[in-house]
Amino acid sequence: MSALTRLILVVSLVAVTTAPAAHAAERMWMGFHDDPVLRWDAGRIDELDAAAQTNATIVRTFVTWANAAPRRPANPSNPFDPAYMLDDVDELVRNAQNRGMEVLITIWGTPRWANGGRTPNYVPTNMTELRRFAQALSARYSGRYPGYPFVRFYGIWNESNLARFLAPQFDARGEIVAPRNYAKLAAAAYAGIKAGSPRSLVAIGETSSHGRDKQVPKLSDSTSPGTFARLLAEANPRLQFDAYAHHPYPYPVFFKPTQLVRWPNVSLKSLPRLERSLSTWFRRDNIPIWITEYGHETKPGEPLGVTEAQQADYLPQAVALAKRDRRVEMFVWFVFRDSLGSSWQSGLYRRNGTRKPALARWASTAPPVDARNPSLSARGGQRAPDVNLTTREICATNGEGTAVGMTYRARLAGKLVKVGQIQTRLRSDCSITVRPAFTVAPGKRYVIQFDLNTENGVSLRRTVTIAGSGRG
């Protein structure tokens, strides 16, 4: 290893390239969405430290196009056009990377100059404008520019089955039109994101857990998530996406995570039905699911909410439901701390900064499913399987091409079976490929500890589990 010092790798999105993961939901990205606290609060650095200490591995954030580009850029595809106002996003992405966390950016909200002077929930009059913005944003965080970390995950719009975020939901005859409009919006945003950052992963949907499918006087228009997804697939069955995102909140807010709701509304318990339906409608098997918002609001801030003790009981139940579903790859809790900047009371901290009982449950629930310590499968009898690892903290102080060295130790049933050393190079998306030199026996399960290092002293540790397929 020459001058390379000891380092343990932050493993994100690890995959054996020769065989798919056998039980993807054994690991999930778990984290928080709380822009008022984690992005804008004066104490945001301390808040992010606290989130990292709870074993959070991802932070979700909104990039509201209307705020990022209040006036039309001279060159909309340029990630650094002077019209773009993204300093706070830059800071969050850097701060998250420094703490080993991934970022999910959800793009939504049309500027007035792009939709005829309407509010942000109306689609652009020309989808090319959205495509160019999405391309500029993803290129900015493509890992190609020093000081602007790679962002791996993107979502397109927010709760598009609600008029609050996407209007209109119905036409003058009362027919549902939002899915058809969203199909165009999603296609444009997906194309832009992939043009700017081909290695990024993009989710569509981002649907709310419930809707009415008909107009009701004095109530905001909404479409149920099941109906929305079905009509979306009808509008464009070949729509491209890497995952489908959903917000399976309990509704009403006092429901348990295990509560079934009437289809086509979709709760945590009914996610499998949505998944089967998505496979049928889009004619695609095993569509990954991202839970990009979930939470339980507590009393007294939410009079109809649950007690803090109930929230603490429900949190691990919700995670367990998600974990049992092999398609679920992400679980984001909304919010981290109750605050004046949010109307939600679902935080794991109270407004005064004291802990709710649910915080301890999160801190104990998150580590076993940490996606940085992945669980994979490889073909039985295969030697030196390729393993792709992301090394997020290394990127905080090192650029593309940096030499990354490591010592690995493979164990079978606790017995050391292989010790080896590898040196490889860092890619722009904060990933490396390693080939631990041992043969994966059929039916055996190996635990491999990686201790990675760089010349500038970065040191991390992650553990990878590899199961050999076939019978031993």
Regions found by a protein language model. Name each.
Residues 7-17:
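Bacterial N-terminal signal peptides
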Residues 24-58, 62-64:
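Boundary/entry segment of secreted carbohydrate-active catalytic domains
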Residues 41-45, 131-145, 150-152, 173-309:
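Noncatalytic carbohydrate-binding groove/subsite architecture in carbohydrate-active enzymes
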Residues 54-217, 249-251, 299:
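Substrate-binding cleft and catalytic face of glycoside hydrolase catalytic domains
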Residues 143, 160, 165, 173, ...:
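Aromatic-rich peripheral "rim/lid" segments of glycoside hydrolase catalytic domains that contact
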Residues 417-429, 465-466:
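Solvent-exposed serine/threonine-rich low-complexity stretches and specific carbohydrate-binding patches
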Residues 448-458:
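Enriched for extracellular/lumenal, surface-exposed ectodomains of secreted and cell-surface proteins
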Residues 458-468:
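Edge beta-strands of extracellular beta-sandwich domains
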